[in-house]
Amino acid sequence: MKKYFEKKFWKYIYRRSLNNWYKRNFSSPSPEFVKHEIIKKNNLDNSLWIETGTYYGDTTNLLSNISSKVISIEADKRLYDLALKKFKNSKNIQIINNKSQNTLDEILKNNHNHKNLCIYLDAHLCMDHLTKE
């Protein structure tokens, strides 16, 4: 019975998100589950993912489940600290507190041991905090 209601709940959330996105003429940002499906569909084997903008770590968590390593860059100190706590037991996640334009070159130079490299540019101005990325 619980699974039935969970499924109904998520269908409602997805439908509502898609309707809102449609009303905005499919302008950015797309619903989170749409982004996640695109990421899963385009993932490469044995990949290193670099994510700019950790925020609350939902995409970071997804990436850690489908890749060999995730490096997530978060400029906001509060969100960085939250991510460190959230992922303290994750062996394949590295969180960096910096702006992506200040650290991306260094990350690319120091990570050549992965077969594939994928970059998810997700740093942007969020509604509830201000970080100029």
Regions inferred by a protein language model and the residue ranges of each:
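A short alpha-helical cap/connector motif
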Residues: 1-119, 124-133
